[in-house]
């Protein structure tokens, strides 16, 4: 079959056996780790009902996208390297594989942006987040992201920003030409804009958390109390909160007349809001690490693409381009490690699932906290 690389590229020499071996070994490792890791995380998210919540629906969608890219697109890259950096499947197959690869890339970028917005809502507007971000809302967001990704990846199939086999990359993807005769620059600019917007949302979230942690000088105002209810201008509200939670004794405070006291609330219930806030921060940290790694691993490849579009002189060095392409491949298998090492809840559910599969769990002995 003909090679579909553009005529402006120089004819590459055949790869040395050592280079081909390193490429095949590393790519095979990436395929195995990505498929197995994302599949295990997906099974865990589906099986454990405690993880059927808004952030983990999005994580399941990211895992499915990475499995799609690793199981379908990467084997064709593997075969092209094995065949000496040549494409032997025809033009239509090349366009389909390139479409799936670009679809997965834009889907991950769009989804990470939507996740950053939901993370900000979870911490800054938690009540709105818990009421509005239901299963159907998450499903609508996921459908919207896939629709936008298809809209971005499909036009090159119709030769708008042509898909072709790039021999230097061993894959079918965008054919990047000079910016004066280029159709792919708009797609790259949009991808860079999405990544920048995602970072700005997380930056706003960091500023929000930092502002709430600032120490302010305390101004003491005397509170009014005849029966230890402490109401009035100087009251901090803690006595009223204790009374509502079922810890108050004596008559109803004057400011809480007509409000029923909750007598069934336990002492642990008082710390639920703080625990949820810490959990949301841990989940936000996990997704930010994913976003940062996506930007880090795709950054060199984006630099190489912009280099080919705007640079007039030398071409992109072969070693840099190969490393950039393989780093973008590695991004598909990095998320499972981030999930396990940065999320305590996922790690606990994962270990619990493995213990449940191996042996029956022993009942815990009763203990008393002194």
Curated annotation (Swiss-Prot):
Keyword Cell membrane listed: yes
Compartments reported by the entry: Cell membrane; Endoplasmic reticulum
GO biological process: signal transduction
Effect caused by changing residue 152 to T: Found in a patient with autism spectrum disorder; uncertain significance; induces response to endoplasmic reticulum stress; negative regulation of dendrite morphogenesis
Annotated InterPro entries: GPCR_Orphan/Phoenixin, GPCR_Rhodpsn, GPCR_Rhodpsn_7TM
Annotated membrane topology: Multi-pass membrane protein
PROSITE patterns referenced in this protein's UniProt entry, alphabetically: G_PROTEIN_RECEP_F1_2 (PS50262)
A molecular function GO annotation: G protein-coupled receptor activity
Function: Orphan receptor.
Sequence similarity: Belongs to the G-protein coupled receptor 1 family.
Name of the protein in question: Probable G-protein coupled receptor 85
Source organism of this protein record: Homo sapiens
